[in-house]
Amino acid sequence: MRWNDRTRGLVLFALALLIYGFGIGRAFVFDDVVYISDNSLLHRPDAFRAFWFTSEAFNYYPLFWSLLRIQWLLWGNHPLGYHLVNLLVHCTNALLVWRIARLWRLPAAWWVAALFAVHPVNVQTLSWAAEQKNTWSFLFMALALFAFDKHTARRDWRSYAVAFVCFIAALACKTSTVCLPVFLAMRYAFTQRANARAILLKLMPFFAAAFAAGVTTMWFEQNRVGAKSLMSTLSLWQRIEASGAAFWFYLEKALLPVHLTPMYQGWVDSTASSHGLLPGLLLAIALVACALLSRHIG
């Protein structure tokens, strides 16, 4: 068999399909019931209007909810369709990771994508139909990243427009994608220092969209999801401390994926206080070290 790009892509797609396809016939679990089966808003004839123009949903992820609504119209309360869509989007994401890794000329780009495709931390997302917001948001974020890189390489303004639209779509699926403009700013500050200021100006609309999405999500989290009581127990300083600790916690899960669970103990007052400054300081040192290393290599 000739080992060309098409073959590599098919093998990568099939690998993700094989690893996560065995349990595709499973029932709804955890929030699937709340998000799909028992979600009266999802079943309403005016669901699309409600998702985009009201605050009735659990959170303001209008594109995610709209995609879920389309699936409800297609296969109703049957879990198979939702799990299949989630799996196919994940397989597509693996191909995008490969494409981006090649664009960045990373060594062993295909193996990087293969690791992403089969990594155990994806089990939660692929087992939980309601977690389509992860796979869809990653898809649009990866497309935005790819298009922005294309724009910076070719000065193609259509690619810039595509990148911005895809970023808005990613935010409309899950707000955790607000990190993209920060990542892009850091990436080009290290790799294209001469053009860093111009690129930062181009990223201003991305930062504005991320800020708006973040403020909206904070309101929904406090008034719809019920996070207000938890947030009220943490001071601003404790939240900063917890953020530094959370980075290392999830990095540990990525490097050593053991004792994984769909839900971890929240960052409550007592645990936030126990983190101290060390995790945040180590994170800052790591970022500075990466910047210096990039400058030295560049």
Describe each region flagged by the PLM.
Residues 1-298:
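Polytopic membrane enzymes that build or remodel cell-surface glycoconjugates and lipids
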